[in-house]
């Protein structure tokens, strides 16, 4: 009996399912049915499987596509190799979807950025560089999916996000040398101007922004998956989660700084709810000064430093989008296939 796969979870998790689904279509069933329970727009970035994907609310989906299938909901967090840190999300989905008995090599992403999002990314990055008087841009994603805003406080009980104090420190220090673009869907509470752009962009536009940037710095969240897929150098700081599970230690362009290595306890998400593990992990992203310095150095070692000069800056929200009436040139488009 043929299978239909249901994919759910956060954006990074959904993205990590794509390589295994592509392999399944190419090697097992070219007509495979994939049901998107979340983040359907991310499937559009895969030229291989985008025509095999249906949203949950598609009219007639059950009768027309599912009734004669075995319905499968792959759950990587319940895979022994995953919760014992033997595979990352990409490999875990591959084992579950393609029935690998041995741990497979990590499969590559095959992402396609459409022209609209490429243009958006290039325009925004160039605008921010010009505004801050810098020649290089760094995308900084400080918060993971567990972040919560409570009044003037931003907290992450899951221990995956940068502490607010360190967010300000990172932006201030990197802003001396680079145009900093903060990737966040939550407003940062502050009474002073941050030397960074905080654009309002959707997930596909962020793909374009990271593609046009020079470096990525982040935590256990979506942006690092984009950076890996788009061959961007990156620094990933982990706290409560294991880099072997959620990141790409084998990527030579990645610097992984494991802040929670000596103190974290595995939190069995989607298996059980371990309140003790969550409580013990919640401070896993508090940075000591020496760790903070390592983070900054990992960026400056790759990009170099720029001369200091005073720059007047204003908040950047959206980038100009080229039209047929523009007299200036459009940015260079990337190849259709962007391979990790």
Regions found by a protein language model. Give the residues of each.
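Structural motif
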Residues: 2, 137, 215, 315-317
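Short, well-ordered alpha-helix to beta-strand connector turns
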Residues: 28, 49-50, 66-69, 178, ...
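An N-terminally biased module of ancient metal coordination in phosphate/nucleic-acid-related enzymes
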Residues: 307-340
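N-terminal pre-catalytic "stem/leader" segment of glycosyltransferase-like enzymes
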Residues: 1-47
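Short acidic/His/Gly/Ser-rich catalytic and metal-binding motifs that mark active-site loops
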Residues: 145-152, 189-192, 265-266
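Leloir-type glycosyltransferase catalytic cores
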Residues: 78-127, 131, 250-308
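Donor-binding and catalytic core of enzymes assembling or modifying cell-surface/extracellular glycoconjugates
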Residues: 11, 15, 153-244
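Conserved nucleotide-diphosphate donor binding/catalytic pocket of glycan-assembly enzymes
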Residues: 38-120, 127, 131-153, 241-244
């Amino acid at each position: 009996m043929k299978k239909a796969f249901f994919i759910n979870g956060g954006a990074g998790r959904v993205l990590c399912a794509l390589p295994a689904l592509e392999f399944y279509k190419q090697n097992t069933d070219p007509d495979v049915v994939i049901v998107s329970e979340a983040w359907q727009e991310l499937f559009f970035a895969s030229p291989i499987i985008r025509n095999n994907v249906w949203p949950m609310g598609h009219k007639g989906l059950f009768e027309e596509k599912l009734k004669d299938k075995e319905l499968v909901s792959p759950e990587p967090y319940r895979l022994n190799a995953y919760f014992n840190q033997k595979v990352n999300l990409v490999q875990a989905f591959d084992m579950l979807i393609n029935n690998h008995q041995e741990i497979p090599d990590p499969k590559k992403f095959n992402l396609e950025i459409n022209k609209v999002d490429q243009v958006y990314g290039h325009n925004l990055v160039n605008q921010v560089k010009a505004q801050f008087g810098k020649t290089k841009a760094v995308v900084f994603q400080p918060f993971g999916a567990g972040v919560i805003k409570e009044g003037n406080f931003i907290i992450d009980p899951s221990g995956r996000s940068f502490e607010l104090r360190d967010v300000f420190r990172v932006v201030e220090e990197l802003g001396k040398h680079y145009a900093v673009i903060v990737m966040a869907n939550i407003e940062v509470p502050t009474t002073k101007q941050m030397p960074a752009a905080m654009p309002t962009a959707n997930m596909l536009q962020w793909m374009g922004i990271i593609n046009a940037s020079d470096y990525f710095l982040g935590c256990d969240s979506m942006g690092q998956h984009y950076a890996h897929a788009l061959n961007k150098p990156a620094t990933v700081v982990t706290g409560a989660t294991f880099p072997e599970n959620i990141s790409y230690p084998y990527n030579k362009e990645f610097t992984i700084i494991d802040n929670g290595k000596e103190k974290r306890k595995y939190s069995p998400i989607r298996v059980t709810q371990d309140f003790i593990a969550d409580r013990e992990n919640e401070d896993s992203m508090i940075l000591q000064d020496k760790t903070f310095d390592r983070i900054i150095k990992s960026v400056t070692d790759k990009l170099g430093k720029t001369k200091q000069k005073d720059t007047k800056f204003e908040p950047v929200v959206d980038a100009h989008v080229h039209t047929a009436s523009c007299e200036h040139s459009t940015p260079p488009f990337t190849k259709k296939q962007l391979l990790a």
